[in-house]
């Protein structure tokens, strides 16, 4: 029984790393001279996400909508607008960004991320 439970948990975990029935834009979003690259995906319910990679460095982003940034792999520090503290974010962690704001990141290790647009 325990073995079967482990298999089910592994399958659930693998499913969470895959998106099905989506449209992917062929043209990549390229920022900071190619050090941050993402692709936009649209789900059947019109939900939009970007999947991307950030190379080590420091970057500042502006937002038009509320965002959920999920770190798939890698490590970075984030400073949200109007905050003085930097927060360390690693694989499996996430953070929220307010609409019409900005945030800074210091990417410590090459980072794969998923950004969900929540508006």
Residue ranges and their predicted role:
Residues 98-119:
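Ligand-binding loop in jelly-roll beta-barrel domains
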Residues 32, 59-61, 79:
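Short loop/turn motifs at secondary-structure junctions and domain boundaries
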Residues 2-47:
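A short, N-terminal "cap"/entry segment at the start of jelly-roll beta-barrel domains
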Residues 43-63, 96:
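Conserved short histidine dyad/triad with adjacent acidic residue
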Residues 64-77:
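Short, conserved beta-strand element in jelly-roll/cupin
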């Amino acid at each position: 029984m325990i073995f079967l439970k482990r298999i089910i948990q592994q399958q659930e975990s693998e499913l969470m790393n895959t998106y099905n029935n989506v449209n992917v834009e062929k043209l990549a979003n390229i920022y900071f001279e190619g050090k941050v690259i993402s692709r936009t995906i649209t789900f059947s319910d019109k939900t939009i996400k970007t999947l991307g990679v950030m190379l080590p460095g420091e970057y500042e982003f502006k937002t038009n909508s509320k965002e959920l940034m999920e770190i798939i792999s890698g490590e970075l520090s984030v400073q949200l607008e109007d905050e003085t503290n930097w927060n360390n974010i690693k694989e499996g962690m996430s953070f929220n960004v307010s609409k019409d704001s900005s945030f800074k990141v210091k990417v410590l290790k090459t980072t794969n991320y998923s950004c969900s647009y929540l508006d």
